[in-house]
Amino acid sequence: MRLENKIALITGGASGLGLATTERFVTEGCRVLVTDIQAEQGEELSARFGNDVLFRRCDVTREDEVEAAFEFAEQELGPIDAVFHSAGIIGAVGPITTTPGDEWRFSIDILLNGTFYAVKHAARVMVPRKKGSIISMASTAGLMGGLGPHAYAAAKHAVVGLTKNVAAELAGEGVRINAVAATGMATPMVAVSLTGDPSKIEEAKETLAETSPLKGRAGLAEDVANAVLWLASDESGYTTGHTLTTDAGLTVGATPEGPAFSEYQPLFREGGKRGLESS
């Protein structure tokens, strides 16, 4: 098993990407502390897995609660080997001219400040032991423009930058930090955006499959879980400061119709011929 006898802390682990990752980690021999604000779902998850999964309610915008969660995990489970910070929201959607300041601040608080708190306290417990893997949830919206609400995109760009900066700092301490950048995946959060109902994951999956660069293949929570598993395991032991994309090629220009700007290919070909003829 790839995480046998390992201990992990997963924020936002009661649903979506965090839940899929929790389930994947447990099958690989890991014991997990799940934190979330969804207490009922978290308690149900803990009951399902017994001693392999503990739950603690935690609001990631509260640094004191994040710090307490790390202390609880170390006390109840033992030294933390891996942290996956997946807690997040999509946030306010709309043009920049009408984006309310309070909604902007709320999104930044969860998506960026929450990441900072998780990374900070993960480093605090890992640096003295000179080992550990931290994984943050970024997004394709953090790698390119035109995707997602403005606050979400800004925060995810910042998460990518934070990952690089902290990796440079902690490499000498033996601690690794990476991020996973996903596109829209079939999760309750994305289902809300596409259908207005978090339970309509199958309907969201159909829409995602139709628009995916990998024609007919929707992105699944399990795809992200597998990426996080690799980054948490010793298999990625020489990888730090990296943002791993699970996006069906979106950020390299793949589209359902073929490569981005493929409509210009005939012009490029003709231009190339003219260039050869005139050379």
Segments predicted by a language model, with ranges:
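Active-site helix of classical SDR
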Residues: 119, 155, 163
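Conserved mid-core segment of classical short-chain dehydrogenase/reductases
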Residues: 67, 90-105, 128, 148-151, ...
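Alpha-helical segment proximal to the catalytic Tyr-Lys
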Residues: 124, 168-172, 237
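Short C-terminal tail/terminal secondary-structure segment
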Residues: 93, 240-279
